[in-house]
Amino acid sequence: DAVFHLVTAAKGAEEFYTTANNSARTETVEEAAALDDKLISAWTGHPHLRVIDNTLTFEDKMKKLIAEIASFLGEPEPYEIERKYLIEYPDIRWLESNPACQRIEIIQTYLNSAAGEEVRVRQRGIDGNYIYYQTIKRKVSDMKRVEIERRLSQAEYLKLLMLADTTKRQIRKTRYCLTYENQYFEIDVYPFWSDKAIAEIEMSDEHTEIVFPKQIKVIKEVTDDDSFRNASLAQIKE
């Protein structure tokens, strides 16, 4: 599943915001913008959140929504376009105090798979409340991968753990999901690093400009560097 949030006209298209055509709408522009921020915050932490802003025209907004949905559902297969960055170890207090950020604990296990495929299962959640996923990935390019994902019951998850690839260790990480400037960052903090972390962002267009908050210090982009992929970090060294 995924969440596609269309930003209110009260943020970026104020001239089109009106209460005249909707008797249920009573908020001022400022109130509507504040409620929109709260709604985005409520969905922050979802594994697939997309925020559709008012940068251009309403028609462009609808085209972007359709592109995001097509990217998620896939034509003919679902795929992800993802950019990945090595960053300095983030300010955890800033992240955890930020209302636009949600902390998630993840345990990721790689399963035995066919050549050219990557199969993993995840436990994802916080405070004892977890959901489970199986994901199959096939590489298309450095930035683009076919991704097929399905929800699992706890029983299915535990059964699939029996198929774990014994050449790889489990990956445990804390993920901070952060919305900023209508972008959705996933910042992964690993227990074996004290000086760096990984920031990822998914998009529907490979040429989308990315704007980082000033609190996030980018060391370099590592999208095409396989050594920073979770599958490589999980590899047990001889």
Residue ranges and their predicted role:
Residues D1-S41:
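A glycine- and Lys/Arg-enriched "phosphate-lid" helix/loop adjacent to the NTP-binding pocket
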